[in-house]
Structures are given as structure tokens and as C-alpha cells.
Amino acid sequence: MAGLSGAQIPDGEFTALVYRLIRDARYAEAVQLLGRELQRSPRSRAGLSLLGYCYYRLQEFALAAECYEQLGQLHPELEQYRLYQAQALYKACLYPEATRVAFLLLDNPAYHSRVLRLQAAIKYSEGDLPGSRSLVEQLLSGEGGEESGGDNETDGQVNLGCLLYKEGQYEAACSKFSATLQASGYQPDLSYNLALAYYSSRQYASALKHIAEIIERGIRQHPELGVGMTTEGFDVRSVGNTLVLHQTALVEAFNLKAAIEYQLRNYEVAQETLTDMPPRAEEELDPVTLHNQALMNMDARPTEGFEKLQFLLQQNPFPPETFGNLLLLYCKYEYFDLAADVLAENAHLTYKFLTPYLYDFLDALITCQTAPEEAFIKLDGLAGMLTEQLRRLTKQVQEARHNRDDEAIKKAVNEYDETMEKYIPVLMAQAKIYWNLENYPMVEKVFRKSVEFCNDHDVWKLNVAHVLFMQENKYKEAIGFYEPIVKKHYDNILNVSAIVLANLCVSYIMTSQNEEAEELMRKIEKEEEQLSYDDPNRKMYHLCIVNLVIGTLYCAKGNYEFGISRVIKSLEPYNKKLGTDTWYYAKRCFLSLLENMSKHMIVIHDSVIQECVQFLGHCELYGTNIPAVIEQPLEEERMHVGKNTVTDESRQLKALIYEIIGWNK
């Protein structure tokens, strides 16, 4: 508050003013006043103590530790300042320094149990789980002194639950947290711990139940935190990283809910969940929220996503998933050199944050670019290991069912699902090597080898359909794979990818099932009309892309006049149908037409030429703000903004038409 910092404070009012600011949680303003006062009296115990407290509340833990270090030096007889310093260093993730300061207090019986708790927390954060467990059990047994009695039993049980969670014993952690919650009553952080354990054991419904309770109580008890305001479109002020926000566990709950929705492939809901959380400025966001924002908005804003993940990698600490996710995304966007560089520069992170499976998988993906045969062998080794695990787990499920052991069934099924999630990407990476070579029979062979495990998996079925479709003599077989995917979502057909619908329509046409193709197109048209009625400004491309693909098919077969006419009609009205993707399909047909005209391989009627010129004129008019090409997110040399438009490419195509038919002579 500028006025406050610049105003003259009356004599005798300074202390009262500072305490009022602290009472009202206006810590930043208190820091300003205390900083000015300490310039005049740098050894003031009261000033340093209050400044350290304010820094701690502002989560400026390193600065708080500096204040308490000064106090410890000025007043060595008051050992509580050493404890506060150690706690602040721990919060700042400076674990060796925190351990060193805490060790000096171990001989003081008054602080013994608190120091043990702090040391247990430090070891837990450093990943030394046996060391942490030993200290927690020491406290629970009463060896921590008088303070470690009944009051700390709850803390001890929670700590044991956290250790079980870190050890991967999620069911046991759930039991521990649940029992503690029943004994102590509702606590937001404890309820979150339970939800997290349920999430990790894939019990999403139970996790969402506890998340809902955290959110409902947070909204009811603290309406000032503005939950949901950003999603509703209100322009709201940041609530900051206050103690109240931390105590509600709302940020953690929203992040976990977003992760669950993302796992369930409800991507829009996941994005909305992140905007529902209490509003904060970007510089105030915690690492987990920043990581999740990057991940969930990657398709829409990839450049921003990469920047956030790269930034997080420089922080200490960062969410453990950051390293692996950044590498996977580099590979997804085909920045293999960057992925290789990051792996080489961060060998220490490789062993800490990548499982052997993930490291081998990334290594194979990177190798694909220079030595595809070697990469295929690496992927084959991974696939072989995973198929053995799948067979073993299938046998375990069968045995558990025979013995009617529900717990064993659940455990084996969860392990099977996790192994399948590893197997599918390996399989797809193998198939992609042959796909890139347009060797579709070999892609089909790779998929057929995996039918034992994957015949019910949607991703596998979709890609089998694509490879059958691309072989051009297996349209009937492709229909057998596309149809179940479409029928599964028939009531919400626009949830199906437009290219799947287009390929199914083409397959129907190529097998003389024109009635089925027309029925499917009528269904798409009906749903688009309904959506257009509900939201007149919404752009919808499904039927347009289906018609574009059919038009492309006719052009490929040499029937350009019918194909081009279909393409032109598919983009009407232009304000709703013209987009980067639809323009991509349309211009390919026009380029093919112009190539064949320039070689004098085809003759086109003047009326069709006139129709083409008119169409390109409309695209020129409506395509001013539509990118012709979506640029790669990390491209150093960006395309000229004025040239990367549908308008510019329309003009170029029109000029080519004039040149070929001689209108410009």
C-alpha cells in the first residue's frame, strides 16, 4: 500500500500498526514497515522476529530463515530461534542446511520431539524412507520425550500413512488415513491425503467423493476465495497464497480433481477444474498447478506449455512427473534432438525421476530418427518383457477369480491395466516406424501380433482401422473396426473424431454401401444443426471434413469436376466451415487439379474453373485471420504473419489458375 509506506507514522503508533497489519494478514505491508525500521535498528530482536514471522507467512522461507539465523546469533541463549530457522530452511527445501541446524538442538530435551519430527520430515522429502520411518516409530514409541505422547499420536499415524503411500502401499495408506480421519474429525489436508491415496490405487469415485467435500466446505466457509469465478468469466483479483488458502487444501483438491478427469479423458472438464480454483496471478502459482496447466493446455497452447515445463525443471523442487513429461512431449512434437540434449544434460535427474521402462522407451524413440532398425529391436525387447508380464498377470487374475479372492483380483487387474498402459505406446511406436515408410502390411502385422491382449483396447482398434483403410483393398475389414467406435458414441456422434467418420463414410462408398454413408452423414448434419441452434456462433467441422475427404477421394480417382464441386460445397457457409484443417484438405485437391491441368492430363469445363475462382475469392475474403499452417511451437524462425493466412494462399492458388488457363496473358 503506497500511501501507508510513504506516510509519517505518529510516535508510539508503530508497534500497534505493525500488529494490526499482521492481524489482518497484510504481511507484505508489515514487511515494508519492518524493513525500514530495521535499517535504523538492525539488531532489534522484536523487529527481526516479526519480520521472520511475516516472511514465513508470505512463504518467503529463505528470507525467514535469514531473520532467524540473525536472531540466533544475537541471542544464542534462546534456542527456539534455531528451531524456527531449521523449520524455515526445511520449507525452503534446503534440506542439508535444515538438518545441520536441527542437529544442534537434539541435546535440548525441550525441543527433542519437535526436532525428531522435523528430521523425519526432512528425510521423507529427501527420499530416505527407512530413515524417516525409524524416526516416526521412535516418536510413536514415546522416545521423543514428554511432548511425544498422546497429542502427537494423530500426527504419527498420518506420517505412517504418508510413508506407506510413498512406498507404493496405497491400500494400506488409505486404511491409515481413513482411520485417522474418523478418530480426529474432518481436516482438509488429511481428507486430501486420503483422496490422493484413493487416486493412486485407481479408486477414482472414492477420491472424487473426498475432493467434493473439500471443495464444498472451502466454498461454504470461505466464499471470499472466489472459487469458480474465473471459469464463469468474471474478472477477479488474485486471492494470493494466504494461510487460509493453504489450510483449506483447495488448490491441492482442484489439482487432484483435474488429474482424475484427465486420466478419464474428460479433457475439457479437467481444464475447467483448473480455472475453478481460487484465482492467483501466474507468478503466485505453485509448481503443481503450473505443471498441470502446461499439460492440460498443451494442444491449444504448446509453446506456453513447453516454456512452463522448462521453467519448472530449473526450480527446486519441481513435481517429479515434470522431467518425464517434458521428454515425452518433446518426442510427441518430434523435437528428438532437444529430448536427447535434456537427457544428456540431466543424467542425475534421469536416475531419480525416470523408471527403467520410461528411460528405455524414450531412448528407443530418440534412436528412431537415426537408426530405425535398431530402435525397432529396442522396442521389441520392451514389448517382449511387457507381454510376459501381461501373461503372468492374466494367469494371476484367473487364479484369483477361481479362489474368489476379491482383493487379489483387484490388485492383479490394476497391475494388468498399468502394464497395458505401458505396452500400448511401445506397440504404437513400433508400428509408426513402418507407417512412416508407408509399409502398411508390416504395420498390420505388428498389430496382429498383439491381438491377444489388445483386441478390446480402443486405441489399438482405431489404429488397426486406419492401417486397413490405408491399404485401399481392405475397406470392408476397416468398416469392422470403425463401426464399433462410431456406434459406441452414436448418441453423441460429434464426440467421434471427424477423420474416423470420414474414413467410415469413404469405406461405405468404396464397398457400395451408399445408403449407410448417407445415413451417417444425415446423423452428423442433424447433430450439427442442433448444436448450431444452441450456439449460433460455434464453428463445427465434422460434416465439412467428411465431405472434404469424400471430395478428395473422387479427385484421387480422377473425377476432378465432381470432387472439386464437393469440396467447394462442403465449406459453405465460409464463416463457420473455413478453418486451418478444412483449408488443408481443400488446397490439396486444388493443387492436384492444377498439377494435372498444367501437364494437360485433364480438361476441365469453364463453368468449373469459374466456380473454383469464385470459391478462392470467398476463401480470400473470410481467411484473413485464419492461419494456413499451424507452426511448430518451438520454431525459431516464425512465418510472416501476413503470409501464413488462408487469404494469402487463396490468392496464390487463384494466380496459378489464371496462369495455367492463360487469363493473365
UniProtKB/Swiss-Prot annotation:
What main location does UniProt list? other
Q: Does the keyword Repeat apply?
A: yes
Coiled coil where? Answer: 508-535
Question: Which windows of the sequence hold TPR repeats?
Answer: 11-44, 45-78, 154-187, 189-221, 393-424, 425-457, 459-492, 544-577
Q: Where in the cell is it found?
A: Cell projection, Cilium
Please name the GO terms that the record assigns under molecular function. intraciliary transport particle B binding
Gene Ontology BP annotations: intraciliary transport
Q: Which UniProt keywords apply?
A: Cell projection, Cilium, Cilium biogenesis/degradation, Coiled coil, Repeat, TPR repeat
Q: Which Pfam families match?
A: TPR_16
- Show the stretches that span the lipid bilayer: none
> What InterPro entries does the record tag this protein with?
TPR-like_helical_dom_sf, TPR_rpt, TT30
Q: Which GO terms describe its cellular component?
A: axonemal microtubule; intraciliary transport particle B
Asked if the keyword Iron-sulfur belongs to this entry, the reply reads no
Q: What does this protein do?
A: Required for polyglutamylation of axonemal tubulin. Plays a role in anterograde intraflagellar transport (IFT), the process by which cilia precursors are transported from the base of the cilium to the site of their incorporation at the tip.
Q: Which family does it belong to?
A: Belongs to the TTC30/dfy-1/fleer family.
The protein depicted here goes by the name Intraflagellar transport protein 70A
Q: Which organism is it from?
A: Homo sapiens
- Record lineage: Eukaryota, Metazoa, Chordata, Craniata, Vertebrata
